[in-house]
UniProtKB/Swiss-Prot annotation:
Membrane topology of the entry: Multi-pass membrane protein
Family: Belongs to the bile acid:sodium symporter (BASS) (TC 2.A.28) family.
Species name: Homo sapiens
Effect caused by changing residue 223 to T: Decreased transport of taurocholate and cholate; decreased transport of estron sulfate; decreased expression at the cell membrane due to intracellular retention
Protein name (record): Hepatic sodium/bile acid cotransporter
Catalysis performed (reactions): taurocholate(out) + 2 Na(+)(out) = taurocholate(in) + 2 Na(+)(in); cholate(out) + 2 Na(+)(out) = cholate(in) + 2 Na(+)(in); estrone 3-sulfate(out) + 2 Na(+)(out) = estrone 3-sulfate(in) + 2 Na(+)(in); taurochenodeoxycholate(out) + 2 Na(+)(out) = taurochenodeoxycholate(in) + 2 Na(+)(in)
Record gene name: SLC10A1
Length: 349
């Protein structure tokens, strides 16, 4: 198993017992624990009726899946060609581009006032579709770059575990909201505190585990690629959803889902498919990508919040006037904020 025209093996070794140290185990446990509470808290913001609406009228979901498995793999492939990366570097980027959406997108969608029901449905469907789409896309795009059978390295077990870690806590949160809504705010507040503490622990343990090794992956071309990939995903995800006339909440949701990748699955494939002397420091490319997608996502959230802050005071009077006028002139207005005969499709602009 080797890439065509691959350069000489990297003079690189992973830290001793990498992936099997106590700190690695602690990091894995904390990540699962944190993900559970993230999904539980997000589940408390969802409703079965709205999830059903997205599934029965899957316009937003279909556009999101096209963006996820159309834009990101093609972006990774094109960036590899534009920057004339070595074949092994192009492969590492391609694996990241072919991965499904990550759970970070759900947090970003919440911060961007997106449609959380669509966000969770998208993450679930994207991960489920990865069972077939990842091997197909890796087979299509890796031809001519890699001699081995990369599609057989897809971590199906990891994909199923990702599905379970999304579906179970979200379902608990949804049931809690419908059956015991009085406890919902305590769960969300407690969850946020636990997530914050876990985030600090994850940051510290990641720094201990990786150390200076990630510096080997920080070449100018890889930095450029890992910074452009999430940005292009965020941008084109928004543009595509705007072209199909999704509303603002759904556009922001599709944008976040497209730009955020499941870097854990990407790391698993690189670890399984290539020995350290072949993949070298590129083993840490998914972590580099995660740093940039986190930074760019937070920047977009900050820009959105600033926009909301400056926009709201100016539009508030207009909104109040419009609401009052509507109630007076349209007797068919309903108490839930919709109107008789109005299209209630969750993503209609």
């Amino acid at each position: 198993m080797e890439a065509h025209n691959a350069s000489a093996p990297f003079n690189f070794t992973l830290p001793p017992n990498f992936g099997k140290r106590p700190t690695d185990l602690a990091l894995s446990v904390i990540l699962v624990f944190m993900l559970f509470f993230i999904m539980l808290s997000l589940g408390c913001t969802m409703e079965f009726s709205k999830i059903k609406a997205h599934l029965w009228k899957p316009k937003g979901l279909a556009i999101a899946l096209v963006a996820q498995y159309g834009i990101m793999p093609l972006t990774a492939f094109v960036l590899g060609k534009v920057f004339r990366l070595k074949n092994i570097e192009a492969l590492a980027i391609l694996v990241c581009g072919c991965s499904p959406g990550g759970n970070l997108s759900n947090v970003f969608s919440l911060a961007m006032k997106g449609d959380m029901n669509l966000s969770i449905v998208m993450t679930t469907c994207s991960t489920f579709c990865a069972l077939g789409m990842m091997p197909l896309l890796l087979y299509i795009y890796s031809r001519g770059i890699y001699d081995g059978d990369l599609k057989d390295k897809v971590p199906y077990k990891g994909i199923v575990i990702s599905l379970v870690l999304v579906l179970i806590p979200c379902t608990i949160g949804i049931v809690l909201k419908s059956k015991r809504p009085q406890y919902m705010r305590y769960v969300i507040k407690g969850g946020m505190i636990i997530i914050l503490l876990c985030s600090v622990a994850v940051t510290v343990l990641s720094a201990i585990n990786v150390g200076k090794s990630i510096m080997f992956a920080m070449t100018p071309l890889l930095i450029a690629t890992s910074s452009l990939m999430p940005f292009i995903g965020f941008l084109l995800g928004y543009v595509l959803s705007a072209l199909f006339c999704l509303n603002g909440r759904c556009r922001r949701t599709v944008s976040m889902e497209t730009g955020c990748q499941n870097v854990q699955l990407c790391s698993t494939i690189l670890n399984v498919a290539f020995p350290p002397e072949v993949i070298g420091p590129l083993f840490f490319f998914p972590l580099l990508y995660m740093i940039f997608q986190l930074g760019e996502g937070l920047l977009l959230i900050a820009i959105f919040w600033c926009y909301e802050k400056f926009k709201t005071p100016k539009d508030k009077t207009k909104m109040i006037y419009t609401a009052a006028t509507t109630e007076e002139t349209i007797p068919g207005a309903l108490g839930n904020g919709t109107y008789k005969g109005e299209d209630c499709s969750p993503c209609t602009a």
